[in-house]
């Protein structure tokens, strides 16, 4: 556990979540303006709601050097046409051009080297707070599954963030609770560049 112009690379099929066909629609960003919409939503969730300190190249937008190499899944609210959910996808060819996966800024991925040509990285997933009932994330997952199948990719990686405002105790508890049953086999394990001292930080409380 660690402490710490748009190019299209795949083909995601526009779709609609079957139980909410009139409310939401899924698409892939095809223009810089659509990517900017995703970045604005990310800023709203990560900076304004969760308090992340972001280094923004454009005010009010969460962006970094990986964005222009990624594909961006979008879920729009049909009535307003606004983006209310997004997922960022970095396919292997784009990661090669970029020179790395985002995860490699946090972890050593040496043991996944033989998987790289079939390995997709996802991240920057977020949903507008008014639409977290389950339908939007289900639609994003459906789009991600379709993306993987259509492009013949086999492996999915990515980082998930856990808040550290309590000094890392909850993050340590999360690792303690999930590690015994969910650690990858040793030949696939990745190691953090800035390791969280979970042995010292874990408490008797349940992770949240």
Regions found by a protein language model. Name each.
Residues 1-9:
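Eukaryotic low-complexity, non-globular regulatory regions
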Residues 4, 14-84, 88-91:
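Short amphipathic alpha-helix that is part of the acyltransferase structural core
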Residues 8, 33-36, 82, 96, ...:
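A broad, structure-centric signal for solvent-exposed, well-ordered loop/edge residues
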Residues 9, 30, 53, 61, ...:
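Histidine (H) residue identity feature
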Residues 10-13, 22, 30, 57-59, ...:
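Generic preference for well-ordered secondary structure
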Residues 11-15, 22-23, 50-52, 97-99, ...:
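Residue-level signal for well-ordered alpha-helical segments
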Residues 92-208:
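Acyl-donor binding region in acyl/amide transferases
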């Amino acid at each position: 556990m660690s402490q710490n112009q748009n190019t299209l690379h795949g083909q995601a099929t526009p779709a609609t979540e079957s139980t909410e066909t009139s409310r939401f629609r899924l698409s892939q960003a095809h223009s810089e303006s659509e990517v900017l919409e995703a970045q604005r939503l990310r800023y709203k969730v990560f900076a304004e709601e969760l308090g992340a300190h972001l280094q923004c190249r454009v005010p009010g937008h969460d962006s970094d050097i990986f964005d222009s190499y990624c594909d961006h899944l979008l879920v729009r609210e049909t009535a307003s046409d606004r983006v209310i959910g997004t997922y960022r996808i970095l396919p292997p060819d784009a990661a090669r051009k970029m020179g790395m996966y985002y995860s490699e800024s946090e972890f050593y991925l040496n043991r996944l080297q033989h998987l790289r040509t079939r390995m997709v990285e996802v991240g920057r997933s977020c949903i507008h707070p008014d639409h977290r009932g389950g339908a939007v994330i289900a639609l994003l997952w459906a789009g991600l599954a379709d993306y993987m199948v259509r492009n013949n990719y086999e492996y999915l990686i990515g980082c998930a963030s856990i808040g550290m405002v309590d000094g890392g105790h909850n993050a340590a508890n999360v690792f303690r609770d999930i590690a015994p049953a969910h650690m990858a086999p040793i030949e696939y394990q990745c190691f953090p560049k800035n390791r969280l001292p979970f042995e010292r930080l874990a408490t008797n409380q349940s992770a949240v």
